[in-house]
Each structure stands twice: as C-alpha cells, then as structure tokens.
C-alpha cells in the first residue's frame, strides 16, 4: 500500500488511509503497518458494526421475563372476560419463553417439552385478539395463517412451510428473531378429517394438512425460501428451527358441543338403573366446551398425533350482553374510543348513551358474531355522520342513543353556534 504522506517543513504530513484527511484535520491519527486511521473513521466503523449486530444480540439477563401475573394484567387491558383462558395462556407463554431463555434441558438433565396451545371458542370470542396482544406485549414477531388455505405438498394451495415464510417476512428475514416468534393458525377445526375412521382416499385439505403440520408444530428445521414456496426452487433456503416458535391454534369447532354432550349424557340407560335428566339441565355451548377431552377432538376429526402436539387446551366462552357492552367501552383500544378519536380530529365530541351501547350489544347477540360484529354495526350507524361531518361547520358534539341504533332517528348534532343549532333542528 502506498503511504499517503507529503513532506512538510518539519517532516512528513500524515493522512488517514480511509478518508484522506490530514493529521491536522482530525483529533487523532492511529498508525498501523504502512496505514493510518483517524478517530472519525474509527467512530464510523463502530457505528456500522453496532447497527449490524444490534438485532441479533441476545437480550440482557437482567431484562426480566414478564411473570404470568404481569402477562394476565396486560391481557386484561385489551381483552374483556375469558379469565380462565387468559390465565392458561399466561402460564403457557411464560413457561415457553422460560424454556427458550434457559435451554431445553435443566441442570438435573430434565428435558423441557414444548407447550403449544389450542384455543376452542365461538366466533368473536377473542381468540385472535388474545394471540395478537400476547405477541405485542412480548415484542416478538407474530403472524397469522388460515388453515383452510393449506394443502399437502404437491397440491394447489399453500404449503405449511409458507407459514414460517410469513413469519420471516414480519421480521425482515431475521432467522434468530423468527425463532422467538408466535404463529397463530386460525380455523384449525376446518382441517378435521371428513370421517372418524382413517380415509383410504386422499384428504389433501383435512387429514393431509394435519399430517403436514405435525412436524412443524412439534419442532423441526424447516427449509424456507425467502421469496415464497414452490415457485422459486432455485433460491437459497433459510433454515428455521420451529421448536423455538410458539404455535397457537384456534377454531370455533361448531358441532363439538354435540360430541361432548353425547359423551357426558347420563340419561341414556334403560330400566330402573337409568338416570332421568330434566330438560332444564341443558348446558350452554360454552359450558360444554369446558368439559372437552382429547377423545372428543378425535371424534370431531382431529388425528390423535395432532392433538398430542397441542398439550395446552383452553376454551373461551360465548360473550353475553354485559361483556359486549364492556368491550365497547373499557379496553384501551375500545371501539367507542377509536371512533371518538376519529371525531376529535374533526373537532367534534362523540357521545354514546347507555341505551345505545345496550342496543348495539343486543344487535351483535342477534347476529351471533360476538365482538366481531360490533364494528360493522357502529360503521353502519355512523356512516352518514362521518360522511357529512367534514363538510359541516360548528358541529361540536354528536350524540348517539338507542333510537339511532335501531334506525328510528338521526344522530343528534350539537352546534357551538346557536343559529346553526336552530337551522340543524329544522
């Protein structure tokens, strides 16, 4: 290497071999064998290295893992009800990340198993929201997959490996981050096999998908192309260890209550030993779900091996009217708060009367869509107001009552100017 130096009055003038600045232009010039580097270039190199390794550095040991109580408290801020499910999830998630932090084997040589989770509950009961809230709180990558789109390898549809590919996309293809992520597979009940007995014919979207998911959920090293499944076979594959990924599967399991009821029924005997059951003893779907056993899931259509990969099973109950009213108002991101924030951007206050909230909850109950139906009801009720409000002047408040929800009247608009109020009333 040619030394960048020039003769000056008292000797050589030295230059940085990287940026070309002279020794007089920098604070410090460090000499090496035939090369020099200035303090500014050293700082720049440090910045580059820090930027590249900051995402893969392990978390400090001092950074404590949230306790099950802390996880549950955070879930309470965003999810109403489902207390038992929250407790089960908090413990399972805590144990999973404790296993990752301390290794699969304890000091006594005890191997710690992987605890994937199965959520059983009706539509709109909060299964997806629980999984999303957990991932956000723990600051780990999260992705959702729809089990109905999955097929066995070699058939039209999505490979199960595409689930991991989506997770990698969420964290910019950082494998170390992806291996600490959470995957939520929705509609898992839709891949139940079509008959209770093993089928002779191919069931590529039912039992076949369950077989394909087995290894992925239990833990394997999945080879995933960065740009998607079967269409780019020439690309270099990324190796992802799925034993460190937490899988949460959820489904409504419509009809499972009948399977459970059939098993627990005691009034089917004959003769003097038969137990007579009252018609009033009929249990709700939620109550029956709490009595679910692996044998019920097998009868429903999940294969025993698949059920064995989901050792933590918890059920969610149907949301009643009071719970739906709470969901509308209490969570940090409650729907009424979201719409109030939108109206605030137009310098208007949005107020929901108590009877309006109850009417919204009743409508959602009638639709049997749980909390999922609340937004569509609010959207249709507020559509005209949200259309007119940006063009209106002096509207300071919008009041919604029961008659508005039932379509019997328009929202009450309160103007800051008395003249406008009178004109609006006309």
Swiss-Prot record:
Binding residue positions for ATP: 122-129
Binding positions for Zn(2+) per the UniProt entry: 16, 19, 38, 41
Keywords: ATP-binding, Chaperone, Metal-binding, Nucleotide-binding, Zinc
One Pfam family it belongs to: AAA_2
BP GO annotations: cell division; proteolysis involved in protein catabolic process
GO cellular component, as recorded: HslUV protease complex
HAMAP family: ClpX (MF_00175)
Similarity field: Belongs to the ClpX chaperone family.
Function, as annotated: ATP-dependent specificity component of the Clp protease. It directs the protease to specific substrates. Can perform chaperone functions in the absence of ClpP.
Protein name: ATP-dependent Clp protease ATP-binding subunit ClpX
Source organism of this protein record: Vibrio parahaemolyticus serotype O3:K6 (strain RIMD 2210633)
């Amino acid at each position: 290497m040619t030394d960048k130096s020039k003769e000056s009055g008292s000797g050589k003038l030295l230059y940085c071999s990287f940026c070309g600045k002279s020794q007089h232009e920098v604070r410090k010039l460090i000499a090496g064998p035939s090369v020099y580097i200035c303090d500014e270039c050293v700082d720049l190199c440090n910045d580059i290295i820090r930027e590249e390794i900051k995402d893969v550095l392990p978390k400090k040991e001092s950074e404590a893992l949230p306790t099950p109580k802390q996880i549950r408290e955070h879930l309470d801020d965003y999810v109403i009800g489902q207390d038992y499910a929250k407790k089960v999830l908090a413990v399972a998630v805590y144990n999973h990340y404790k296993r990752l932090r301390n290794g699969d084997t304890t000091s006594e040589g005890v191997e710690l198993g992987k605890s994937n989770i199965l959520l059983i509950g009706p539509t709109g009961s909060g299964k997806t929201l629980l999984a999303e809230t957990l991932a956000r709180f723990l600051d780990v990558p999260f992705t959702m997959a729809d089990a109905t789109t999955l097929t066995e390898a070699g058939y039209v549809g999505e490979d199960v490996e595409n689930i991991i590919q989506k997770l990698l996309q969420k964290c910019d293809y950082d494998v170390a981050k992806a291996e600490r992520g959470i995957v939520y597979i929705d509609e898992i009940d839709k891949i139940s096999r079509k008959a209770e007995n093993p089928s002779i014919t191919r069931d590529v979207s039912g039992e076949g998908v369950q077989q394909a998911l087995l290894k992925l959920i239990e833990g394997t090293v999945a080879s995933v192309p960065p740009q998607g499944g079967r269409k780019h076979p020439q690309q270099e594959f990324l190796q992802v260890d799925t034993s460190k990924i937490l899988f949460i599967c959820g489904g409504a399991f419509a009809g499972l209550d009948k399977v459970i009821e059939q098993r627990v029924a005691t009034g089917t005997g004959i003769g003097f030993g038969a137990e007579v059951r009252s018609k009033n003893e009929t249990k709700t779907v939620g109550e029956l779900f709490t009595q679910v056993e692996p044998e019920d899931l097998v009868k429903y259509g999940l294969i025993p091996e698949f059920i064995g990969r989901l050792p933590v099973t918890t059920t969610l109950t149907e949301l009643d009217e009071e719970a739906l009213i709470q969901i509308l108002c209490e969570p940090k991101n409650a729907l009424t708060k979201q719409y109030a924030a939108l109206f605030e951007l137009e310098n208007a206050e949005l107020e929901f009367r108590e009877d309006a909230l109850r009417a919204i909850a009743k409508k959602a109950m009638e639709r049997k869509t749980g909390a999922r139906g609340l937004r569509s009801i609010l959207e249709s009720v507020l559509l005209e107001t949200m259309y007119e409000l940006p063009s209106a002047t002096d509207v300071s408040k919008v009041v919604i009552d029961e008659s508005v929800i039932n379509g019997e009247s328009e929202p009450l608009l309160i103007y800051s100017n008395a003249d406008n109020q009178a004109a609006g009333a006309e």
